[in-house]
Design a protein with these regions (language model features):
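A contiguous loop/helix-start segment that scaffolds small-molecule binding in enzyme catalytic cores
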Residues: 22-24, 32-150, 169
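Short glycine-cluster motifs
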Residues: 1-31
């Protein structure tokens, strides 16, 4: 099957690696009843500022936030809680490292969720060249120019705005 961390990326409509932002993904968990080696602690991994995906940590969000901040992430680093990724009752809760616990509490999420942390969740970055339709690689030619892509996105925005206006009437 597909791991829930991949399903979470789809739910977030996010790429876990982006040029100039993060080229690594750390998949880990908080220490709980089963410890983790100190060299693999959340605090240790946080020093890298890579995208981090955490399993089995939803019940420890206060401690998780503290470990992430002490390790090097700022309180306002983008984060997300993805409850039951890929399930019909999936919920995506966007927040920051500093508001993880409050966000989960307000949504009544106590387990069965992944935590994703990193600047890749900001959403304002250039997409990966691998998926950029204006980028030619050894295996494919660019499918459009940057100008054409800009026009396409502008048209899509106009269509979405018109659709939303039609639904609100």
């Amino acid at each position: 099957g597909v791991s829930s961390f991949c399903g979470a990326a789809a739910a977030l409509e996010a790429e876990y690696t982006l040029p100039g932002i993060s080229q690594s993904v750390v998949i880990t968990r908080m220490a709980g009843r089963t410890p983790v080696p100190e060299k693999e602690s959340v605090r240790s991994f946080a020093a890298h500022q890579a995208t981090m995906v955490l399993f089995l940590s939803t019940g420890l969000l206060k401690e998780l936030s503290a470990e992430l901040i002490e390790g090097g992430y700022s309180e306002d680093t983008p984060a997300a809680i993805v409850y039951k990724a890929t399930w019909p009752e999936q919920k995506v809760l966007r927040c920051t490292v500093g508001t993880l616990e409050q966000t989960a509490r307000e949504a009544d999420v106590t387990k069965t969720a992944l935590i994703v942390v990193g600047e890749v969740l900001d959403g304002t970055y250039e997409r990966s060249k691998l998926y950029d339709p204006t980028f030619t690689t050894e295996f494919r030619q660019a499918s459009c120019s940057k100008k054409e892509l800009g026009q396409t996105r502008e048209n899509q925005s106009t269509e979405m705005r018109q659709e939303a206006e039609g639904q609100s009437k």
